[in-house]
Amino acid sequence: MTTVRNIAAGVRSMTSNAFLADGERTVLVDAGDGFDAAARIEEATGGLDAVVLTHTHPDHVGNVESVVDAFDVDVWGFDPDHPLVDHGIADGDHLRIGDAECEALHTPGHKNDHVCLYARGAGILFAGDLVFANGGFGRTDLPEGDRETLVDSVEHLLETVEGSLDAMYVGHGPAVETNPRYHVELAAQAARMG
């Protein structure tokens, strides 16, 4: 069973959450920024197999280089041309994160290279900055942001998860482990209204 912990918990700087998924393949989903991620990974698991990025905004990738240096791992992300990304992820690709088989869902709107990672069998979603707890959704006023595209991405996510969702790990704020689909539905409604 995959254990997921937020190694950015308690950090008091402008960072994203950074989720360490432990299991068959120990993976860091987003690296955060402005704290010693490598030390927190070492303390939690003693090792790392890969980094996977939901997107490449600075608050999600600021610690990537120090993590790569500490653990000599490759980085996976949607944009293979980004200097921090070693391996491109395409929509529909499957990646092992912890013990879970995750499908990459290209979900632009907040940023063109945004992906969510959904493990149907485990009922786990790494949502990045697409949606948050309590109906929040990613900003669309930043470069590459587009509200209509974000709404389409949230609707695509709802169609994909079909109710088999037990935990949603988001880019900012608390994880959602009680009825996460409801929070995605709220985000879809809120994004449509704006």
Task: Annotate each PLM feature.
Residues 51-61, 106-113, 169-174:
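Histidine-centered catalytic micro-motifs
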Residues 90-118:
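Internal catalytic-core helix/loop-beta-alpha segment
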Residues 27-29, 52, 103, 124-126, ...:
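Residue-level marker for buried hydrophobic side chains located in beta-strands
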Residues 1-42, 116-133:
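Conserved beta-strand hairpin/beta-sheet module of binuclear metal-dependent hydrolase folds
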Residues 1-14, 43-47, 180-194:
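Haloarchaeal acidic low-complexity proteome signature biased toward cell-envelope/secretome components but also
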Residues 34, 112-191:
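Metallo-beta-lactamase
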Residues 7, 78, 89-91, 105-107, ...:
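Conserved beta-strand termini and adjacent loop/short-helix elements that scaffold enzyme active sites
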Residues 31-101, 186:
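Active-site HxH/HxHxD metal-binding segment of metal-dependent hydrolases
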